[in-house]
Amino acid sequence: MTSASQYLYDHVTTKVLMDDMSFGDNAPRPGGRLPEFDLATVDGERISTRDFVGRKPLLLITGSYSCPMTASSDPVLKELYKKFANEIAFVMVQVREAHPGEHSEQPRSMEEKIKYARALKMRDELPWPIVIDDADGGLHHALDEKPNALWLTNREGVIIYRALWAGDDTGLQQALDAVCRSRAPALQDSSRRIVPMAMGIGKMREMTLQSGPRAAHDMWRAAPPMAAMAWLADLYRPLPPKWRTVAAVATLGVGVTVIASLLKKPRNR
């Protein structure tokens, strides 16, 4: 477990980004149970793990206002919510800010955390409740501190599926279908990165600029290739996030091809 000062970072670092790329050994996993919680929502109600055991499957998602992965996966989750909301409870946990900056500083009080959760719910028009983790991230620590992961439990409260990134809609779709039929999903543990990361990179510059210049600068320092791809993808902002990144990769490929062909041309003597 990280210390309070490490957990509530003010600058994204290479280590933070690398830690996000895989579940730790102690992360809740299929066959186990979620850590118990009883937390307030942005609407002033309370939600507990006990509310769902024996009654309804639960999809628990981590997210934050400044997180590009959250911003890019929320539209996908909203489409799934339309299909499964009557049978499965969707709940998001407001955790630490993924990309703090001058406009979205790392919250160190419950009041600040509630403010960001409300802003997230309003910006993305989220139909599900958001519960507020404590200022020091007690629940987030127990969930392995991932920025936009999710866990799906069955009616008995047993985890039947987890995903490192909520944007893996293919994996999640089959898991939601399975739990509605009281079956185990074919895929129970997803660490797929390509599609979720393409979506997140497509939103990254937009989200870091929202947080402030410091957040944008931190990405250039922590992961220059990713920051460069995000900058290029942002030029295609009218497109959906995933296709912004696809367009950026295509543009980069064309550029490299042109440069390579120019270098191969014989020089006139």
Predicted segment positions?
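Non-globular targeting/processing and membrane-anchoring segments
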Residues: 1-54, 58, 166-269
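Loop/turn elements at helix/coil->beta-strand transitions in domains of secreted/extracellular proteins
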Residues: 56-58, 86-89, 126-128, 147-148
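Solvent-exposed loop/turn segments at secondary-structure junctions
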Residues: 66-67, 96-99, 136
